Amino acid sequence: MTATPTASLPPLANDRFLRACLRLPTDVTPVWLMRQAGRYLSEYRDTRAKAGSFMGLATNPQYATEVTLQPLDRYPLDAAILFSDILTVPDAMGLGLSFAQGEGPRFAHPLRDEADVAKLQVPDMEKLRYVFDAVASIRRALAPAGAPGRVPLIGFSGSPWTLACYMVEGAGSDDYRLVKTLLYRRPDLMHRILEVNADAVAAYLNAQIEAGAQAVMIFDSWGGVLADGAFQRFSLAYTERVLRQLKKEQGGYRVPQIVFTKGGGLWLEAIADSGCDVVGLDWTMNLGAARARVGDRVALQGNLDPNVLFADPEQIRAEVARTLDSYGAPSAGSGHVFNLGHGISQHTPPDSVSVLVDAVHSYSRQQRGAAG
């Protein structure tokens, strides 16, 4: 993507995140955390108890708004991310999503044969109205009485491949045996699933943008389980199909697009050339090496090991400094969004997040002062 946005930034009290995504100068490195609204927060657990179930929480715009804002009320984070789940799209396709206590997501009607695949189609987006209502509700809560928004709101979806994994396996998997069997035995059926998924994800993200999402992120959580060659054909090609269809701006403002492939370091250059604005990195990557490989043609997001947050405060600060030093001093046309290399653990001490966020802002401000 080009470094010069074709549209301006929306009026926000804090637009660091959007500026970094578009590789524009920032006063400090912006920070937000994957799963920042989650079980590590006592207030989240209280709201979850009121909702009665995870889906009761995710499908209620009022509750979704409440939990989206909870980490922002605790920490000076630079972005909000919609509280939802990546599996809402296949649920709207009729696969029957449920969350069993202690077992994670499960589909009642997984895709197992040609007849199942033949019935698959892009769902009516009205079935996902609760998501778009939540986006609009969160935006209103972030900007009460017409004031500038506190921070931008990120919408998201799972990637076509990651959704397909759940849709074929019927649940999470340790060996991906069912989905890879289908991929190798009947690649025609796998491509059909991925085509439908890509068009569904594009429609879903565009609807989030229309509802008020100011950036969108594609989570390719299972992309890294594919072999070289298979990743390009069955994951990246369909992520690119999504990106080609996405709105690049809304209401005259740029809408940055982030792609995160867990375990995707081998294909960093190809992901950077996919058409996204930002590439998310897991904790196995060296930020400086990644920046050297892709140059400044995209911004980078990441990539602290989430388990660093179980260390003592001094060690957290040291690891934050190491990560920021690894990326290097910001320069014209570069962009870095600090994040974890994967979602935050439910067991994380909340005080550790305070240490992390403060360390990112303070150390990156020092970096800019030294560079200046």
Swiss-Prot record:
Q: Where is this site: Transition state stabilizer?
A: 85
Disulfide linkages recorded for this protein, renumbered to the chain, are none
Which keywords fit this entry according to its UniProt record?
Cytoplasm, Decarboxylase, Lyase, Porphyrin biosynthesis
**Family annotation (InterPro entries):** UROD/MetE-like_sf, Uroporphyrinogen_deCO2ase_HemE, Uroporphyrinogen_deCOase
Enumerate the residues binding substrate. 35-39, 85, 166, 221, 342
- Report the EC code(s) recorded for this entry: 4.1.1.37
What's a Gene Ontology MF term here?
A: uroporphyrinogen decarboxylase activity
CDD domains (UniProt xref): URO-D
Signal peptide positions (record): none
**Predominant subcellular localization, coarse grouping:** cytoplasm
User: Which GO terms fall under biological process for this protein?
Assistant: protoporphyrinogen IX biosynthetic process from glutamate
Q: Reaction(s) catalyzed by this protein?
A: uroporphyrinogen III + 4 H(+) = coproporphyrinogen III + 4 CO2
Gene Ontology CC annotations of this record? cytosol
Q: Which Gene3D superfamilies match?
A: 3.20.20.210
Pathways involved: Porphyrin-containing compound metabolism; protoporphyrin-IX biosynthesis; coproporphyrinogen-III from 5-aminolevulinate: step 4/4
Subcellular localization, as worded in the UniProt entry: Cytoplasm
Q: What does the UniProt record say this protein does?
A: Catalyzes the decarboxylation of four acetate groups of uroporphyrinogen-III to yield coproporphyrinogen-III.
The record describes its quaternary structure and partners as: Homodimer.
Its family remark reads:
Belongs to the uroporphyrinogen decarboxylase family.
UniProt protein name: Uroporphyrinogen decarboxylase
Organism of provenance: Methylibium petroleiphilum (strain ATCC BAA-1232 / LMG 22953 / PM1)
Q: What is the lineage of its organism?
A: Bacteria, Pseudomonadati, Pseudomonadota, Betaproteobacteria, Burkholderiales
